[in-house]
Amino acid sequence: MKLIVGLGNPGREYAATRHNAGAWWVVRLADQLGVTLKADGKFHGLCARIGQGESESWLLNPQTYMNASGRAVAALCRFYRIQPEQMLVVHDELDLPPGVSRLKLDGGLGGHNGLKDIVAHLGTREFWRLRIGIGHPGEKHAVVNYVLQPPRKEEAALIDTAINDSLEVWPLIAEGNYQAAMMRLHTQKQS
């Protein structure tokens, strides 16, 4: 894995919202790895390098708004010649309940504007996704307000569990052992 992207919106007013679950995950991974995400205007985001040489990878939290995430992702991919299939995009997922996370390659976009913009910039859906469940408000018209609100206390605890569970399989993802990562993540007892 050469690039790990955490989707979210920049700014304090969005920091605690459900839509930032992907960004939360990347911040936690950076902490776990002992690196600091730093602003990089060239890549329109907060970045950190992990590893060196052949094992070099990048963490990126775009600081564009969600709907323009592809600009940041494409800039870093072009500069470091990273292929889409070498990338993991971590994002909030309405179709999974809080407490559940799932890893997959390719697939639909589920109406997620951050994913849509990445696909528009890269011209492919062939990249890995780590989907962090945030639940669904029940009504389609309520989705925008729902994702831009902080989770309730009990939901926040479940989302935190999903982030912890998926961080436990990070070493498998990092070494390219995706099947083992999926097996472990998808069969863990999820709350």
UniProtKB/Swiss-Prot annotation:
EC numbers: 3.1.1.29
Keywords tagged on the record: Cytoplasm, Hydrolase, RNA-binding, tRNA-binding
Active site positions, chain numbering: 19
Top-level taxon of origin: Bacteria
A single cellular component GO annotation: cytoplasm
Binding site for tRNA: 14, 65, 67, 113
Record site: Stabilizes the basic form of H active site to accept a proton: 92
Major location (coarse): cytoplasm
Listed name of the protein: Peptidyl-tRNA hydrolase
Record organism: Nitrosospira multiformis (strain ATCC 25196 / NCIMB 11849 / C 71)
